[in-house]
């Protein structure tokens, strides 16, 4: 069930059970008759891994930046709202294992649960593959979010940035298509497919068409920027 997620983060787990644990909330574990490990310990580990990876990357990217500037940039990148947004871009809500009560109270959309799951996932990557693999995953999933300057400024308009990049690389624009919608009227989810000029396809599901398009554009940006890094 985690094939797409592993593809999105560019990492295939040797022990898929670690990823399953990373997506397991304590509410789900508490409902099981047998002992099941939840993601809080992995979250603790992933928080430290993320902070180190981001610190190392910022240190390398901005050799002239002062300590205060680096601290502010790191704080923006690893803040709970930023991590929740990143988790939504990866559609982690689709993989969470939640207890019935948490599910009924909208836990799948709760930012705190999503940011915790993202940190737990990074902790799982670290345990499964070591620091270098965890660092590669962090660099990949944050590819569209690294600051452009020491003030930490970076546009969040992924569609505009993607269009500029594809025009430069392919002299063509990406194509967006609405594939459908689901859910009740007050909680509709929209699926968008984005096709790059080279035929690479990305899909995203969001609470609005515009949001889904931005999410798909963010995934495409990460892909193109990781190609240039490689």
From Swiss-Prot:
Catalytic residues in the record: 47, 119
Main location: cytoplasm
Residue ranges constituting the DRBM domain according to the UniProt record: 157-226
Catalytic activity: Endonucleolytic cleavage to 5'-phosphomonoester
Pfam family, one: dsrm
Binding site for Mg(2+): 43, 116, 119
Domain annotation RNase III: ranges: 2-130
Source domain of life: Bacteria
EC numbers for this chain: 3.1.26.3
GO BP field: mRNA processing; regulation of gene expression; rRNA processing; tRNA processing
Cofactor(s) required, per the database record: Mg(2+)
SUPFAM superfamilies: dsRNA-binding domain-like, RNase III domain-like
PROSITE patterns (alphabetical): DS_RBD, RNASE_3_1, RNASE_3_2
Subcellular location as annotated: Cytoplasm
Alphabetical keyword list: Cytoplasm, Endonuclease, Hydrolase, Magnesium, Metal-binding, mRNA processing, Nuclease, RNA-binding, rRNA processing, rRNA-binding, tRNA processing
Alphabetized GO MF terms: double-stranded RNA binding; metal ion binding; ribonuclease III activity; rRNA binding
EC category: hydrolase
Any GO CC annotation of this UniProt entry: cytoplasm
UniProt xrefs under HAMAP family: RNase_III
PANTHER family membership: RIBONUCLEASE 3, RIBONUCLEASE III
Subunit structure, as described in the record: Homodimer.
Sequence similarity: Belongs to the ribonuclease III family.
Function, in words: Digests double-stranded RNA. Involved in the processing of primary rRNA transcript to yield the immediate precursors to the large and small rRNAs (23S and 16S). Processes some mRNAs, and tRNAs when they are encoded in the rRNA operon. Processes pre-crRNA and tracrRNA of type II CRISPR loci if present in the organism.
UniProt protein name: Ribonuclease 3
């Amino acid at each position: 069930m985690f094939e797409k997620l592993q593809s999105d983060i560019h990492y295939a787990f040797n022990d898929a059970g670690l990823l399953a644990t990373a997506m397991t909330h304590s509410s789900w574990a508490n409902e099981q008759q047998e002992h099941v490990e939840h993601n809080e310990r992995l979250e603790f580990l992933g928080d430290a891994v993320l902070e180190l990876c981001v610190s190392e990357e910022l240190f390398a990217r901005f050799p002239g930046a002062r300590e205060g500037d680096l601290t502010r940039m790191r704080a923006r990148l690893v803040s709970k709202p930023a991590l929740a947004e990143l988790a939504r871009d990866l559609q982690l809500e689709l993989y969470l294992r939640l207890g019935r009560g948490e599910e009924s109270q909208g836990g799948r959309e709760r930012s705190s649960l999503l940011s915790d799951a993202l940190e737990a996932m990074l902790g799982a990557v670290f345990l499964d593959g070591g620091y270098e693999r965890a660092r590669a995953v962090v660099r990949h999933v944050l590819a569209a979010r690294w600051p452009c300057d020491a003030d930490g400024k970076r546009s969040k308009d992924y569609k505009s940035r993607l269009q500029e990049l594809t025009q430069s690389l392919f002299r063509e624009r990406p194509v967006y298509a609405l594939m459908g919608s689901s859910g009740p009227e007050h909680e509709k989810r929209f699926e968008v497919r984005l096709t790059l000029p080279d035929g690479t396809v990305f899909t995203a599901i969001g609470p609005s068409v515009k949001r889904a398009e931005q999410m798909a554009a963010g995934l495409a940006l990460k892909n193109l920027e990781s190609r240039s890094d490689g």
